[in-house]
């Protein structure tokens, strides 16, 4: 079928219309007085959410070109979510503001490529300034406050995260489960997380989130490659009879064996997943032993005379829950306290004996994974709709706390970006010229957009509030919850620097794609075939 081709200004304006629709749908959720969005579902009850990236994923427009604009900005939100775990609404609002300002200049005859260069240079300047303004966080209460702000200023979330951090430390793993009651509860259990995910995406049990979640699984831990199907059968058969899932951790699984596991998983014969072993060399073997001890199983290794093809069911480890993503695996086990404590003491002795700071650091990592545990937040709610919304908010909060630990915190509520506007203008005017300068000034005019929207959602005049904020000290901003100007650090209104930086970088990157677009090629939907003739009328037929 012939394709539709749209050029230059018409193409960019069509993309802009899609971006306008997406940005408005997402922006209503921004700030402490942001509204919820109701998502209609084809099957099941509607979903009520306050999460930018979730809303963005649901928006599909009838016009293909406009929908392409939606898809571009959706990528900015998704990328920010992947990198920082939060800041998706900020990224969307920023990208929208850049596109609006940029297209105005392109329509007036500015060179889009030179504008992009100016925007790129402005991005690098702003990223450096954000890092300079960031403060490191050590106190668990300060870290928890970051999570509360991310979850919409929810005090229950703040208390929950503070308690979790106190119990398992700021580097701890905090995971979410759906609870059985109406109250949200915190439970700290023995657990371990390592940075290896499933070998094949076909192992994912939740296609929407691309996660494999197994309750009460068996765990086979092997320090060798698994090449043959015959090696797997003696393990697969008894596990299938037991009716429980199986997770295999091995150095690698070759094609034939992997195909067998995938086929069994897809046919529903056995709920199974395979994960590559973490670490390298001797350290890999030690980490596999840690996993085996944590789950009450045995490491299948030829050094101990054990092979996969003669492994019994009682040699396998057992876990309460295992969650696997494409990048990581979290094991929650219980009931093996004595063996775990003995292993922890053994690692501590090794740390005392070693003189290498590198080895000591790696031993410390293993110690933290074994003894730190996993904090499990069991999300409770009166209805399923409320639970989904609460879970998304808690997920944002946990991601925000991790980001805060990594790169520190900056004043929240759009303050940082608004205050950087005069700094960027001064730098650009002294450093850049011509259309590169115009590109940087486009960014400067767009930076207050998140603050303006937060103020507007609180019933204030966004432009007036933004101008008043620029006149004040860097840490002072508009508190939309109380309609007052306060010191954001003192008031505990802070954002992770990583979230602010990622939102800025991704918004500017994807906005530049729209500005530099010259042509859009669209494949129209095929028209319905004409109905066949009636009686002997000799109507048209499609062959």
UniProtKB/Swiss-Prot annotation:
GO terms for cellular component: cytoplasm. InterPro entries: Chaperonin_Cpn60_CS, Cpn60/GroEL, Cpn60/GroEL/TCP-1, GroEL-like_apical_dom_sf, GROEL-like_equatorial_sf, TCP-1-like_intermed_sf. The keyword Chaperone applies. Coiled coil: none annotated. Disulfide bonds: none annotated. GO terms for molecular function: ATP binding; ATP-dependent protein folding chaperone; isomerase activity; unfolded protein binding. ATP binds at residues 29-32, 86-90, 413, 479-481, 495. It comes from the Bacteria. One of its GO terms (biological process) is protein refolding. PROSITE patterns: CHAPERONINS_CPN60. The keyword Chaperone applies. Residues 533-543 have a biased composition (Gly residues). It catalyses: ATP + H2O + a folded polypeptide = ADP + phosphate + an unfolded polypeptide. Residues 524-543 are annotated as: Disordered. Its EC number is 5.6.1.7. It is found in: Cytoplasm. Keywords: ATP-binding, Chaperone, Cytoplasm, Isomerase, Nucleotide-binding, Stress response. Belongs to the chaperonin (HSP60) family. Forms a cylinder of 14 subunits composed of two heptameric rings stacked back-to-back. Interacts with the co-chaperonin GroES. NCBIfam families: GroEL (TIGR02348), PRK00013.1 (NF000592), PRK12849.1 (NF009487), PRK12850.1 (NF009488), PRK12851.1 (NF009489). Together with its co-chaperonin GroES, plays an essential role in assisting protein folding. The GroEL-GroES system forms a nano-cage that allows encapsulation of the non-native substrate proteins and provides a physical environment optimized to promote and accelerate protein folding. HAMAP family: CH60. This is Chaperonin GroEL 1. It comes from Anabaena sp. (strain L31).
């Amino acid at each position: 079928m012939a394709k539709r081709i749209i050029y230059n200004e018409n193409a960019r304006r069509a993309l802009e219309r899609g971006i306008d629709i997406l940005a408005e749908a997402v922006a209503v959720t921004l700030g402490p007085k942001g509204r919820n969005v109701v998502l209609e579902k084809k099957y099941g009850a509607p979903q009520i959410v306050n999460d930018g990236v979730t809303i963005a994923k649901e928006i599909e427009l009838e016009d293909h070109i406009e929908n392409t604009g939606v898809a571009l900005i959706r990528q900015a939100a998704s990328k920010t979510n992947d990198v920082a775990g939060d800041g998706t609404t900020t990224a969307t609002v920023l990208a929208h503001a850049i596109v609006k300002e940029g297209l105005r200049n392109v329509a007036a005859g500015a060179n889009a490529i030179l504008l992009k260069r100016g925007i790129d240079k402005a991005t690098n300047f702003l990223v450096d300034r954000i890092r300079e303004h960031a403060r490191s966080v050590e106190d668990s209460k300060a870290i928890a406050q970051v999570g509360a702000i991310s979850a919409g200023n929810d005090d229950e979330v703040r208390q929950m995260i503070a308690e979790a951090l106190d119990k398992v430390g700021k580097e701890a793993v905090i995971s979410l489960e759906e609870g059985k009651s109406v109250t949200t509860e915190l439970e700290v259990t023995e657990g371990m997380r390592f940075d290896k995910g499933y070998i094949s995406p076909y192992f994912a049990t939740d296609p929407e989130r691309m996660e494999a979640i197994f309750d009460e699984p068996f765990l086979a831990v092997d320090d060798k490659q698994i090449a043959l199907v015959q090696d797997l059968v003696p393990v697969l058969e008894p596990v299938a009879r037991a009716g429980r899932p199986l997770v295999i951790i091995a150095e690698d699984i070759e094609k034939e064996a992997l195909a067998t596991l995938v086929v069994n998983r897809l046919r529903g014969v056995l709920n199974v997943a395979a994960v590559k072993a973490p670490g390298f060399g001797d350290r890999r073997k030690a980490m596999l032993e840690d996993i085996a001890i944590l789950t009450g199983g045995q490491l299948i290794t030829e050094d101990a005379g054990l092979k996969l093809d003669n492994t019994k069911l009682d040699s396998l480890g057992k876990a309460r829950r295992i969650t696997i993503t494409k990048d990581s695996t979290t094991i929650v086990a219980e009931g093996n306290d004595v063996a775990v404590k003995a292993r922890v003491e053994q690692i501590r002795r090794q740390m005392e004996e070693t003189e290498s700071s590198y080895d000591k650091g790696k031993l410390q990592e293993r110690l933290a994974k074994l003894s730190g545990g996993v904090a499990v937040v069991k999300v409770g709610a009166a209805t399923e709709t409320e639970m989904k919304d609460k879970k998304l908010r808690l997920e944002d909060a946990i991601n925000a706390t991790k980001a805060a630990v990594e790169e520190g915190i900056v004043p929240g509520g759009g303050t940082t970006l608004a205050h950087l506007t005069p700094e960027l203008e001064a730098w650009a005017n002294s450093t850049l010229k011509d259309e590169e300068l115009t590109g940087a000034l486009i960014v400067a005019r767009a930076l207050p957009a998140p603050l303006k929207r937060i103020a507007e959602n609180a019933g204030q005049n966004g432009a007036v509030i933004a101008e008043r904020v620029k006149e004040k000290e860097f840490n002072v901003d508009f508190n939309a919850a109380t309609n007052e100007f306060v010191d954001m650090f003192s008031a505990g209104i802070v954002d992770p620097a990583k979230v602010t930086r990622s939102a800025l970088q991704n918004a500017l990157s994807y906005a530049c794609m729209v500005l530099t677009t010259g042509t859009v090629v669209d494949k129209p939907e095929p028209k319905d075939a004409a109905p066949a003739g009636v009686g002997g009328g000799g109507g048209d037929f499609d062959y």
